Each structure stands twice: as structure tokens, then as C-alpha cells.
């Protein structure tokens, strides 16, 4: 219908992966039955499931002769490849039998242990006057123990010796044919053996194809536990092979297969968020498949209660940013709900979109299992936004907008306040929710900035005081140094004066002696 994404998603899937989506459209009656039957016949004709394709052709009156011929051809090729890969099939079967045998042995050991525990019973009865001990009659139970002959498993080294490039290619083609005819479990087992036998530095394209086959086999076999583990090796292989354009296409294919894995395995939905928010995969979404934003938004909202508030807010901000960037390319009620609530703060439009979201989720193959969870968490998001903006909230208005039963509204509101950790109380007299003073984000920024400013001033004052102290100490030192210099200069001057005085005295004494001598000499006649 208007918001149905089956056509867009099927363009990234092969025929086998399309079948569950077409069956769901048939169950939900979103399209006319004859259109669904024609689409089913066209898809089945692309697979090797010839019997189903023949039935689909007959239901719409098409000629089945081409499918009959195709069936005969596939049977002949299957028998030929089966014979060439017989020793690989024997190895796989022996491994499976060994596992079943080990399981039987464990069950036998558990039963024997239970019988031993039940045999250990010795009840006693006590009377007030006489004490009598009654021993329960012993019953002998005959336990039949079946001797299990251990199964001989073909050694892997022996299997490796028989492998040639031709046989390795036969294993690959046999695995692919098993997948085509719908034997997904056997196909996975043979593909796994192919990967073990194939050298890592050779057959890179076939190894990548085998990894895709293993993932799709687990998905179609509903083996979700192993399918989760299949994604990581594929990511590594995609990152290390191909051109950037090829890697972009491969990542888009992986994203669409991941929808099967993560939405049908609720415990790992957070892993889908981590995958889709990686830069490489977010780029693939924006470039090739913006419709995946629907599933990213649902996964984030559904996982709200499982994440810390700061982590959820960071992820939500990333979602809002990419939804706004791609709004001109892709829109649906889910992305418009995100935009109306977290960007425009238009509660009326958000509520209108939320009503449409419920219909879209119920008709979506991947999202129909999480309708209630999404709607509940979306209401909590609306309530949180109300609380962040308004100081008082009318309860009747809240119940009307969020479609909450008035009788159970008080319980819902109390639980929502507790989970969101808001400071609020219910005013029963006025039928309102009173919010205590909430610090807006800009106020918190101002308060933190003010504290940093005050701290900066304190640091500047401290630095100036330190410098002043250093200057004062430096001034005192300089004064002391000048005083010492003066004293030294005075001492030097004093010593110089004393030296000059001594020299003058000596000269005067010498002059006096000379004069006296000259005067005393007699004059000759």
C-alpha cells in the first residue's frame, strides 16, 4: 500500500529471501489475491523449488511444461554432483550421528542418576511410648542399559587428502544446488565444509558467496542464533575485498539480511543499531537504501529502556540528524514522528503520526512483532518531551494525546516519572502533573560556564599573588645584595684611604730626614 516497502526491500534480496515477505502480504491481505499469486509464481520460477512453482503456475492457469523440463534437468545434475561429493556427505553424516550418539549417552546418564537418587529412601515412624523403626520394603528395579556402539568418524585429514580443485568446485556447486531446491540445512553443512577445505588466499569470490549462502540458509531455517554469528565474518570479508562501489552494494545487501536476523531475535536488536550507525553502513543507507531509516528508528525507540539515558540521547541525536538530512528523499509516519517530536516539538503532529505508525508497523513484515513495544516507548518519549518543556501538564490532555486509559493513567504516569527520573508530583485537586524546577540545557551551560569563569579568576589571582611574592622576595634579595655591595665598597674605600695615609706619612718622614741632613753639613772655607 502507501507505506509498504516490500518492493524496495525485495530489490536487495534473492528469490528465496523474497518468499517470506510475499507470504506475509498474502496473510495480511494488503493486495488482491490474484496479484499475490502471480508474484509468488514469478518468484518461485526463479528458484529450484519446482514442485511449489508448478503448483503456483497451475493456480493461475499458466503452462507448467517449462518447469517440468527444468525439474528433470535439476534432478539429473543433483544426482551427478551427489555422487562426486559422496565422501563429503559421508563425513557430514558421520559427524551428525556422533553428535546424536553423544546426546543419547548424556540422556542415559541423567536417567541412571535419577534412579539412584530415588532408591535412597529409608522412612522411620516414632510413637510416644515405644519406638519402632519401619524399614520400607526394598524393591529391585531392573535397569536396561543399552550398549551403544561408538560411531567411527572419518578423520578430517583423510578428507583433505582426497580434495582436488575439481572436487572442491563440485562441493561448491552441489551446495549451491541444495540451496536452490530448498534444502537449506544440507546446503549450510556443505558450504561450511567448502570453507574449511578452500585455501583462504584462493577462490575469494566463491568464499564470499559461501558466506552469503550460510547466512541465508540460517535465516531461511530460522536458526537465529547461528545467523547472528554469521554477520561478523561477512563484514570482514566485505571490507577486505572489492572496489568501494562493490563494497557499497555488498553492505546494502547485508543490511537487508540483518533485518531478518535482528528483528526476529529480540535479544540482539541493539546490535542492529550498532551496525546501522557505523559510518560505512550509514553511508550505504543514505546512498542506496534510505528506506532503512524506518527500521533504524524503530530499533532505537524499542531499545530505549535497555540503554542508559545518555547513551540513548546520543543515539537519538544521530538518528534525528540523518532523518533530517534524508527527509527530501524518504519519509514515512515513523520518520515524521521523530522529526515532529524531536525537531519541531509539534505535539499534535507527532500524535497524528503516532497513530499512523501503529498501522504501518502492523503491516510490516519485520516490525509486526514489536508494535506494542514501540508504541509504549514512543509514548514515553512524548511524555519526556512534555516534561522538559512544560511546568504543569494537564492529565486529561495527556491521556487524550497519548491514548492512555484514564482509569490507569495515574499508574502509568507514576511509572513513567520513576523511569525517566524527573522531579514531579501529581496534583489530584487540579488534575495536573506539577514539574519541579527543571534546569534547561542552556541554563546548565550557563551555570557550568559561570563556575569555570570563577575558577579561572581564582587561578589568575593565585598566579598574580605567586608572582608578587616572588617579586617581593626578589626585591629583598636585591636590597640585601646592594647593601652587601655598599659594605664591600666602603671596606675597599677604607682600605684604600688607609693605604694612602701610610704612603703620605712615609714620604713626609723621608723628606724631613733629608732636610735635617742637609742643614747639619758645615760650609767649607
From Swiss-Prot:
Biased composition (Basic and acidic residues): 102-120
UniProt-listed GO biological process terms: formation of cytoplasmic translation initiation complex; translational initiation
A molecular-function term among this protein's GO annotations: translation initiation factor activity
Keywords: Cytoplasm, Initiation factor, Protein biosynthesis
Entry's Gene Ontology cellular component terms: eukaryotic 43S preinitiation complex; eukaryotic 48S preinitiation complex; eukaryotic translation initiation factor 3 complex; eukaryotic translation initiation factor 3 complex, eIF3e; nucleus
Region span, Disordered: 102-143, 463-525
UniProt superkingdom: Eukaryota
Pfam families: eIF3_N, PCI
Family: Belongs to the eIF-3 subunit E family.
Biological role: Component of the eukaryotic translation initiation factor 3 (eIF-3) complex, which is involved in protein synthesis of a specialized repertoire of mRNAs and, together with other initiation factors, stimulates binding of mRNA and methionyl-tRNAi to the 40S ribosome. The eIF-3 complex specifically targets and initiates translation of a subset of mRNAs involved in cell proliferation.
The protein's name in its UniProt record: Eukaryotic translation initiation factor 3 subunit E
Gene this chain is encoded by: eif3E
Amino acid at each position: 500500500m502507501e507505506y509498504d516497502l516490500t518492493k524496495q526491500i525485495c530489490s536487495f534480496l534473492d528469490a528465496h529471501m523474497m518468499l517470506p515477505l510475499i507470504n506475509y502480504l498474502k496473510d495480511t491481505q494488503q493486495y488482491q489475491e490474484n496479484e499475490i499469486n502471480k508474484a509468488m509464481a514469478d518468484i518461485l520460477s526463479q528458484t529450484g523449488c519446482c514442485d511449489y512453482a508448478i503448483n503456483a503456475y497451475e493456480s493461475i492457469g499458466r503452462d507448467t511444461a517449462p518447469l517440468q523440463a527444468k525439474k528433470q534437468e535439476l534432478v539429473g545434475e543433483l544426482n551427478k554432483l551427489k555422487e562426486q561429493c559422496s565422501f563429503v556427505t559421508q563425513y557430514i553424516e558421520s559427524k551428525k550421528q556422533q553428535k546424536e550418539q553423544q546426546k543419547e549417552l548424556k540422556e542415559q546418564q541423567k536417567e541412571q542418576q535419577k534412579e539412584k537418587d530415588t532408591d535412597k529412601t529409608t522412612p522411620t515412624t516414632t510413637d510416644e511410648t515405644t519406638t519402632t523403626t519401619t524399614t520400607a520394603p526394598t524393591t529391585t528395579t531392573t535397569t536396561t542399559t543399552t550398549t551403544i556402539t561408538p560411531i567411527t568418524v572419518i578423520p578430517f585429514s583423510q578428507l583433505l587428502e582426497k580434495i582436488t580443485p575439481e572436487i572442491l568446485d563440485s562441493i561448491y556447486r552441489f551446495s549451491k544446488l541444495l540451496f536452490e531446491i530448498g534444502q537449506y540445512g544440507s546446503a549450510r553443512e556443505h558450504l561450511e565444509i567448502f570453507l574449511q577445505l578452500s585455501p583462504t588466499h584462493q577462490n575469494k569470490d566463491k568464499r564470499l558467496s559461501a558466506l552469503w549462502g550460510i547466512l541465508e540458509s540460517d535465516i531461511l531455517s530460522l536458526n537465529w542464533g547461528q545467523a547472528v554469528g554469521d554477520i561478523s565474518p561477512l563484514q570482514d570479508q566485505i571490507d577486505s575485498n572489492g572496489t568501494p562501489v562493490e563494497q557499497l552494494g555488498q553492505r546494502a545487501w547485508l543490511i537487508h539480511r540483518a533485518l531478518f536476523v535482528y528483528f526476529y531475535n529480540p535479544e540482539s536488536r541493539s546490535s542492529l543499531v550498532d551496525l546501522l550507525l557505523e559510518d560505512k553502513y550509514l553511508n550505504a543507507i543514505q546512498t542506496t537504501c534510505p528506506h532503512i531509516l524506518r527500521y533504524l528508528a524503530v530499533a532505537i525507540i524499542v531499545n530505549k529502556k535497555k540503554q542508559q539515558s545518555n547513551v540513548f540521547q546520543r543515539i537519538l541525536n544521530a538518528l534525528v540528524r540523518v532523518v533530517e538530512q534524508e527527509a527530501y528523499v524518504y519519509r514515512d509516519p515513523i520518520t515524521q514522528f521523530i522529526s515532529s517530536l524531536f525537531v519541531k516539538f509539534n505535539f499534535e503532529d507527532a500524535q497524528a503520526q503516532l497513530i499512523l505508525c501503529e498501522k504501518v508497523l502492523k503491516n510490516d513484515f519485520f516490525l509486526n512483532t514489536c508494535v506494542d513495544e514501540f508504541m509504549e516507548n514512543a509514548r514515553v518519549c512524548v511524555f519526556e518531551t512534555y516534561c522538559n518543556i512544560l511546568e504543569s501538564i494537564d492529565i486529561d490532555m495527556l491521556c487524550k494525546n497519548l491514548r492512555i486509559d484514564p482509569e490507569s493513567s495515574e499508574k502509568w504516569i507514576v511509572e513513567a516519572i520513576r523511569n525517566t527520573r524527573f522531579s514531579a508530583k501529581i496534583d489530584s485537586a487540579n488534575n495536573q502533573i506539577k514539574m519541579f524546577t527543571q534546569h534547561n540545557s542552556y541554563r546548565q551551560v550557563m551555570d557550568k560556564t559561570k563556575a569555570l569563569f570563577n575558577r579561572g579568576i581564582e587561578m589568575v589571582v593565585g598566579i598574580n599573588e605567586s608572582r608578587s611574592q616572588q617579586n617581593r622576595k626578589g626585591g629583598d634579595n636585591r636590597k640585601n645584595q646592594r647593601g652587601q655591595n655598599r659594605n664591600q665598597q666602603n671596606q675597599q674605600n677604607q682600605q684604600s684611604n688607609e693605604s694612602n695615609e701610610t704612603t703620605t706619612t712615609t714620604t713626609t718622614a723621608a723628606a724631613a730626614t733629608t732636610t735635617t741632613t742637609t742643614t747639619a753639613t758645615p760650609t767649607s772655607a
